[in-house]
Swiss-Prot record:
It comes from the Eukaryota. It holds the Pfam family Sortilin-Vps10. This is Vacuolar protein sorting/targeting protein 10. SUPFAM superfamilies: Oligoxyloglucan reducing end-specific cellobiohydrolase. It is found in: Golgi apparatus, trans-Golgi network membrane; Prevacuolar compartment membrane. Functions as a sorting receptor in the Golgi compartment required for the intracellular sorting and delivery of soluble vacuolar proteins, like carboxypeptidase Y (CPY) and proteinase A. Executes multiple rounds of sorting by cycling between the late Golgi and a prevacuolar endosome-like compartment.
């Protein structure tokens, strides 16, 4: 692209210039009128060249005389196409115009000439479009979106030569940064060329697009020769959930947030290679609740929200020199909801900080309705101490960053020592329009009033000139001072113009005598916009001489003497205030002079591995200290080591005669250990004054959370509530004497739980039980057995409360009313009445509004007509939308909203409505080969693989229930049969569970004797497994030998399972606690279960215990008899304990179940009812729940903590090298499809980190197990499933269901405006989860052009004619048929011989089940009335791992008139609603009621 000369087209400029009369004793003022508002105004550094953009026309203008004259930038293709205008932050010659149509322009000579470049990118507000290299101005990243129709994806371009060439860096990145992102990054560290080239990018997770799985990748080769390496943020490990990166001074920061918490972890690097987690003195750092402030060259300053965001206040922290340890400077800083903080460092002067804090912070914490009383404070020692601002004897308070009234800095400029602000004296800050203009010329020590009323202000000529303009309305004049604001003069704007001032600015270094004022004026009905040049250059003032300057100390101590900071005193040569001269050193900034000081305590900081003591006077070890080579051969030995202090890097203090805190000291070797290693398992047993426990739940600390607690809350049978913060070693009763009737853990945030009473008063914790706060509900909880609290998936503090109104007498006027709060109950607002359930619908997968709410409301607000409408709103029901008029229930999941819709008549089948965006619904097409005369019941199963799974009941006779699992396409509307005859119990739960941590693996129990069951026989069960997300199912392969080395009584065929010999496991419906799943989210590939080998599943009392280490392909018997199990430390510890029989011992394995050791944990036999650990299974602590039953037993239920932390084999941290993942304690494991020899699963080869079983170390915090998605595989039959109205045949092919037709394939042409073609049905469709490319295209064989798209079709398929087309079609079909026949004849049972209608048993939940709700929903109109035991942690839904949340078809719950009635109730089960919130269910009376939704 050739360089084009800029055409100065004055005639094209839609502007008019007005100039005031030239006077020698006043400034010359020139006004230029624009028809539209000018934006993006900036100066090129060290020049009078200014640019701006017309916000409406998309034109760009330039002035070469500091704004007196303006010309349009006239380039080919530019007119009207400018989208945004940007200056380079460090190169004074460069600027960029980003265009609307893929064309963009860059100048390298201050807009004299421009170079055009192309990049197909659209710019949204979510990303900064230009990211600059800190040391090479030709290196720039350009990031935005590439869109085709409505489909957009992120794209990042890069250039290394100033956009002479442009290449794509990476697609789908959510933000990129150069490692060297500031001019001083890496100074003094001798960074390698690799780091200079390094780019960090946030990219989606390998298996999930959600932000909780974001990864931070870096590349030193622009992602050309590699796909990037994950940044080792946390002790050498990668971290998931990276949400943003930022650069400040010499630091690069990355913030990460784990799923199910709002707390962030902040990671810092000062060299682009070594990262450290920042510690904030125990302070939580919340998402969108911290602000990185202007920092120094030797520390980072961050303000962290301390309390509720509805009235935000913060705490100011300052880091040590490497950014790892932060100490608090001042609490209760004033913030606003946008994250702006009232904080500013005084320009050019080290150590002076102005902040605003909240005086009445205690009142504000109590109520968000209290208005903040803000006061101003100043620090002269880098934030160590603060003091009030003083105007005479009065305290002065100034408006700051949260009330920006101008561009640039608020108070200061490069003019040494001059500071200004708008505010007032008195007790606290008043409204801006009640303020006056104040000035200080001694850097904030003393202040005086400059002008009455609020003004914008700016400094020029190094402070010799101050200009101010009225800022409370329109004005026709400016004010200026030539003596530091002591005296003021006025000058009128030309031609009688009166404007509302918007911006008052000057060149960035404040060394010139020219200013620019931007404002607007209204004449008649038109708004006119002006850019006004104010020039003092022609005033009759002499040039200052040597005697006109003074040596001015930048900082004074309490004795008014020059003060030391960073080892020196700072001085400036500054013009005296009262002399009559101008400095006239344009573009020459004032240069500070430094005088060194002797070292003092303030010149030192804590050394690596040390933190400040509680009193702040010393530095103490933060962790075990490194041992010098050859030292510490004995525990009591001594060695010379760090004192805990070091001189702050960059500090220039004089060592001789000064303090020497960093001198090495003699240390004892015990400092090198934090906790002595006993080498043994530690046991702690705690008894409670109750016979049993009613429930427990974990408030799990996530990886991004601060602290080391492992918090459990437990409820006894006596309704006492206990909490432990150390996983059961120490317990404390909470709320003694209070009548807590419900405990509601937050559905989406594990740090939060609510404790409710029947009156509506309650408490909540936001920090896993460390603190509890009180709140008051708007009305008492509802009495209709409905969930009381509903939560927002992304906004932690947003609640919906469903309470009871007019219910004192329980008459017909009693009804439910929903209220909402956006500040965790501090304020409540009416939402809707006569509701059954309301729910926030926002999910990250949907583009819906945060305010989108669905409610079920009785039609005409009349609950007697039994018609429930499904309504939605995004404005809190100021307006509403009716989706369905008569529903049974609805369920929300990550990707789908599913609604059970009633027919017009009671005997009609239910219909299924589906939406992916919460706005548009469509009826689902269910497969005809699911032979159900009338569809009465659905169970919505887990749906996280871009497809919804439903269990459709086929037989609903009590104790004989079974049904079919059907699976949807990617938008949830078209379903195919996945598995027939799947067992279901009376409550609607199905024997179906997905394996956690691995894609597409699931197990289900089917009924193997359907024909007999239909005649009234008892169900017999078989276990099936799928490795391709339900497309194909097979029996489980039994072990070749049992745990004692003996053969089983039945035999397999060639090592493969048969109908007569397979492994069968007890499943979901037989569990006392649904959280006891086969698998763990962190123990990849490992599952345990109890069952037997044979033709069918036998009694649970006859079961043995089995394990798989390869995702269910092969199994091994662990021990005879049935055991309860739990995974710890991500599977590096597995603990099993006998189920339903007394024991003194447990067994544990440290090598994934290959070998087991016995451990005695009690002297008295105990009956263990459950074993638990944190839901992520990453802890080395376990809890056994049970009672002593042997001789010498103690009364009461006990919780036994089993701690493996000191076990010598699990005391050292495992080492993971992200660049060489198999170099140390881990290896890469590839899951396999049992029927594909090439190792492909869902069209790719995935590699997972797994600890080597023989390594004696612990994993610790949750590991990012998935290392990479390797080769993309060619498509095979396993990447397809049968299409709608097709069913699998015995040979594995798909054939039409007799008498039915496939969906009309031409519908795609009308449903998708971008579609060019449609394909004839083949009977196959791609599994939504597959990533395969090429190979067998079983779903697309014969294409046809969509109407009016023939031309595009021919371009897409040139030359596809005749014989060529025949072979393209016939070859895949023939090959697929041949392979299908070969596999079928060689492997008996690959397709499981599944007979339509087979079904399986599911036993009942135990009579003492603690369940109140779990994440399964029965959308059914047929389930028998079931009441609930309300004292079960409703948190169960969040940790049950086989099902997604879906509300229940029966949500009736038992009510109780007394604690005794409650305690006596057994065997009752509640409606299954994942946001059902009741734990304690004491109510007003004790009777059963039939549900009003057709329950029988």
């Amino acid at each position: 692209m050739i360089l084009r000369r800029l055409v100065l087209a004055g005639s094209l400029l839609l502007a008019t210039a007005f100039t005031s009369a030239k006077k020698a004793d006043s400034p010359i003022i020139t006004a230029t009128r624009f028809d539209h508002e000018p934006i993006n105004l900036f100066y090129f550094g060290d020049s009078d060249v200014v640019m701006l953009q017309d916000i409406k026309n998309g034109d760009v203008y330039v002035s070469r005389d500091a704004g007196v004259k303006w010309d349009m930038v006239n380039l080919d293709g530019l007119k009207g196409q400018a989208l945004s205008l940007w200056s380079h932050p460090t190169d004074r010659t460069k600027a960029y115009i980003l265009g609307k149509a893929g064309k963009h322009w860059v100048t390298n000579d201050q807009a004299v000439s421009w170079h055009e470049f192309s990049a197909d990118v659209e710019f949204f507000q979510s990303l900064f479009p230009l990211v600059f290299h800190g040391k090479d101005s030709d290196r720039v990243l350009l990031q935005g979106h590439k869109c085709v129709g409505r489909d957009c994806k992120e794209v990042t371009y890069y250039t290394t030569d100033g956009f002479k060439t442009v290449d794509i860096l990476i697609e789908n990145a959510r933000g990129c940064n150069w490692a060297v992102s500031t001019p001083i990054f890496g100074d003094g560290l001798n960074l390698s060329k690799e780091v200079n080239d390094r780019i960090f990018c946030i990219v989606p997770g390998l298996q999930s697009p959600w932000s909780d799985y974001n990864r931070l990748l870096y590349s030193d080769r622009f992602f050309k020769q590699d796909s990037g390496t994950e940044a080792p943020l946390d002790s050498g490990r990668a971290v998931s959930g990276v949400v943003r990166t930022a650069s400040v001074k010499k630091y690069l920061l990355a913030a990460a947030k784990s799923a199910r918490t709002s707390e962030l972890a902040l990671y810092v690097t000062d060299d682009g290679s070594q990262w450290h987690r920042a510690e904030f003195d125990g302070q939580r750092v919340e998402e969108d609740a911290y602000t990185v402030l202007e920092s120094t060259n030797y520390s980072i300053q961050i303000d962290v929200v301390a309390e509720t965001p509805s009235a935000p206040m913060g705490t100011l922290f300052t880091s040590n020199s490497n950014g790892t340890y932060f100490t608090r400077n001042i609490d209760h800083t004033n913030r606003n909801g946008l994250g702006f903080v009232d904080f500013e460092k005084i320009a050019t002067i080290q150590g002076i900080i102005l902040v605003n804090t909240v005086k009445n912070w205690e009142d504000v914490e109590m109520s968000a309705l209290v208005e903040k009383k803000i006061i101003s404070q100043i620090s002269f020692d880098d934030g160590r101490t603060f003091q009030p601002l003083k105007a005479g004897k009065h305290d002065l308070h100034l408006h700051s960053v949260t009330h920006l009234s101008n561009s640039g800095r608020v108070f200061s400029s490069p003019a040494p020592g001059l500071v200004m602000g708008v505010g007032n004296t008195g007790g606290h800050l008043k409204d801006y329009y009640d303020g006056d203009l104040y000035v200080s010329d001694d850097a904030g020590i003393t202040w005086r009033k400059a002008l009455d009323e609020a003004h914008k202000y700016e400094f020029g000529d190094q402070g010799s000139v101050i200009v101010a303009v009225f800022d409370e309305g329109r004005t026709g004049k400016i004010s200026y001072s030539l003596n530091h604001g002591k005296d003021w003069k006025e000058a009128s704007l030309p031609d009688g113009i009166k404007i509302r001032a918007r911006i008052l600015t000057t060149m960035p270094d404040s060394t010139g005598l020219k200013f620019l004022l931007v404002g607007s004026s209204k004449r008649d009905s038109d708004v006119e916009h002006y850019v006004i040049s104010i020039s003092f250059t022609d005033m009759e003032e002499r040039t200052c001489g040597k005697d006109d300057f003074e040596t001015w100390p930048a900082r004074l101590n309490e004795k008014n003497e020059p003060d030391c900071l960073m080892g020196h005193k700072q001085f400036y040569q500054r013009r005296k205030a009262d002399v009559d001269c101008f400095i006239k050193k344009k573009f020459q900034e004032p240069v500070p002079q430094f005088e060194p000081c002797k070292c003092t305590v303030e010149d030192f900081e804590c050394d690596f591995n040390f933190i400040r003591s509680t009193d702040g006077k010393s530095c103490v070890p933060a962790r075990s200290l490194p041992v010098p080579e050859g030292a510490c051969k004995k525990p009591n030995d001594k060695y010379m080591g760090s004192s805990g202090f070091r001189l702050i890097p960059g500090n220039a203090c004089i060592r001789e005669g000064g303090v020497e805190l960093d001198k090495q000291i003699e240390r004892v070797c015990t400092d090198t250990l934090t906790v002595p290693v006993s080498g043994e398992i530690v046991v702690q047993k705690t008894f409670f004054t109750a016979d049993n426990y009613k429930g427990y739940f974990y408030l799990e600390r996530k990886d991004s959370s601060n602290g080391d607690d492992e918090t459990v809350i437990m409820i006894t049978s006596e309704l006492q509530i206990y909490i432990t913060r150390d996983h059961g070693k120490n317990w404390k009763e909470i709320f003694p004497g209070e009548t807590i009737t419900r405990i509601v853990p937050h559905q989406y945030f594990d740090d939060v739980a609510y404790f409710l009473t029947n009156s509506g008063d309650g408490w909540y914790t936001l920090d896993r039980g460390e603190n509890f706060r009180k709140f008051k509900a708007p009305i008492p909880p509802n009495q209709d057995k409905l969930p009381v609290l509903s939560f927002h998936p992304e906004r932690r503090d947003w609640l919906i409360w469903t309470g009871a109104e007019e219910c004192k007498t329980r008459g017909p006027q009693c009804h439910s009313v929903a209220y909402y709060s956006t500040n965790h109950g501090s304020e409540w607002h009416f939402l809707m009445q006569y509701v059954r359930r309301c729910e926030f619908i926002k999910r990250e997968a949907r583009g819906s509004s945060n305010n989108l709410v669905f409610c079920e409301q009785f039609e005409n607000e009349n609950p007697l007509n039994h018609h429930l409408q499904l309504l939605s709103t995004d404005d809190w029901f100021s307006e509403k939308k009716v989706h369905y008029n008569n529903i049974l229930d609805f369920a929300t999941m990550q990707e789908f909203i599913i609604v059970a819709v009633r027919g017009e008549k009671p005997e009609d089948s239910l219909s299924v409505g589906v939406s992916v965006d919460g706005e548009t619904f469509a009826y689902a097409d269910l497969p005809a080969n699911v032979q159900i005369p009338v569809q009465r019941a659905y169970t919505v199963l887990e749906s996280r693989t871009h497809a919804a799974f439903l269990h459709v009941t086929v037989n609903n006779v009590e104790d004989h229930e079974y049904g079919s699992i059907i699976k949807s396409n990617s938008n949830g509307t078209s379903y195919v049969l996945s598995l027939s005859a799947v067992n279901r119990n009376t409550y609607g739960y199905a024997d179906f569970e997905k394996m956690q941590g691995m894609e597409g693996v699931a197990m289900a129990n089917v009924v193997g004797n359907v024909a007999d069951v239909e005649k009234g026989a008892a169900k017999k069960y078989r276990t099936m497994i799928t490795h391709n997300d339900g497309a194909e199912w097979a029996l489980l392969s039994p072990p070749s030998k049992d745990s004692e080395g003996r053969d089983y009584s039945c035999s397999t065929k060639g090592g493969k399972p048969t109908d007569k010999c397979a492994l069968h496991l007890h499943s979901y419906t037989e569990r006392a606690d649904p959280r006891d799943t086969y698998s763990s989210p962190s123990a990849i590939g490992v599952m345990l279960g109890t069952g037997n080998v044979g033709e069918y599943l036998t009694l649970k009392s006859d079961a043995d215990t089995f394990i798989t280490r390869d995702g269910g392909i092969t199994w091994q018997e662990v021990r005879k008899d049935r055991y309860q199990w739990e995974f710890g430390d991500s599977g590096s510890i597995i603990v099993i304990v006998p189920e339903a029989r007394p024991t003194k011992t447990l067994f544990y394995s440290l090598d994934e179940g290959k070998s087991w050791k016995e451990f005695q944990f009690t002297e008295v036999e105990m009956l263990i009812r459950d074993i638990s650990t944190v839901p992520s299974d990453t802890s080395r602590n376990f809890l056994l729940w049970g009672n002593e039953v042997g001789n010498g037993k103690k009364p009461g239920v006990a919780a036994v903590n089993i701690d493996f932390s000191n076990l010598k084999e699990r005391h050292k941290q495992c080492v993971l090298n992200e660049e060489k993942p198999e170099a140390d304690d881990y290896y890469l494991w590839e899951p396999m499809h049992p029927f594909q020899p090439n190792g492909c699963l869902f069209g790719h080869r995935a590699k997972y980190h797994r600890k080597r079983p023989d390594r004696d170390c612990f994993i610790g915090r949750e590991l990012q197990h998935l290392d990479s998605i390797g080769d993309i595989c060619e498509c095979t039959r396993s990447d397809y499933e049968c299409d709608y109205n097709y069913e699998p045949q015995i040979d594995g092919t798909c054939a039409p269901v007799p008498g039915l037709k496939p969906l009309d394939p031409k519908l795609i042409c009308t449903e998708d405006p971008k579609a060019v073609e449609w394909y004839e049905p083949t009977g196959y469709r791609r599994i939504p989860l597959t990533k395969c490319e090429g190979g067998k295209q079983l779903h697309h064989i014969i294409p046809h052009a969509c109407p009016n798209k023939e031309e595009e079709f021919l371009k897409k398929h040139p030359g596809l004619r005749g014989v060529g087309l025949f072979f393209v079609i016939m070859s895949p079909i023939g090959l697929a048929a041949a392979i299908g026949y070969y596999v079928y004849t060689r492997w008996d049972g690959k397709f499981g011989r599944i007979r339509l209608g087979d079904t399986g048993s599911g036993g009942f939940f135990a009579s003492d089940s603690l369940l109140v709700s779990i994440p399964v929903a029965i959308v059914a109109g047929v389930v028998a009335v079931a009441t609930a035991l309300p004292l079960l942690a409703s948190s169960l839904w969040r940790s049950v791992r086989g099902y997604a949340r879906v509300p229940g078809g029966s949500s009736s719950q038992r009510v109780y008139s007394s604690r005794a009635a409650f305690a006596a109730q057994r065997a009752d089960y509640a409606g299954v609603v994942d946001d059902e919130d009741e734990l304690l269910g004491a109510e007003d009376f004790d009777e059963e009621e039939n549900d009003d939704r057709g329950q029988v």
